Amino acid sequence: LFMYARLGTLARRYDRRHPHFSVRYPDGDGVDDGYFAVCCNTNPYTFIGNTPFDIAPDANLDNGLTMVTVRSLRADRAARIVARAVKGNGALQRDPAIHYRADVDALVVEALGGRPFPHQIDGDFLGETTRVELRHEREVLDLVLPVGHP
């Protein structure tokens, strides 16, 4: 479901030739050429059939957020990115078209040139915006798991 929603967003007259946003972290790191990004707190992101779509191997409920920013949507690079995500084992985070940050407590995504970009949360399209701020609050939720859960 998430994958179909994500692809739907890209198909909606989305400009794949020019970057849409910057991503900034409190330490000053970031990128100014984001086309597409996914922020995760678990991995895999989704499944294609029984195959995990592994974009953030460091993402888990014990760490901060993991931000995966795609810096190019050229057809050849997009195909390589998908293949590496399916391959798993951290292959995607080593791709030169990806900016990867793990264990992040805060980040800001801001439109380039004030041009709004589409965004969604958990597969739900929320419209266009010029700024998204995300924060991770550690240890604010206790999870109860069934006995014998790994």
Task: Label each residue range with its predicted role.
Residues L1-P150:
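Long C-terminal subdomains/extensions of small-metabolite kinases
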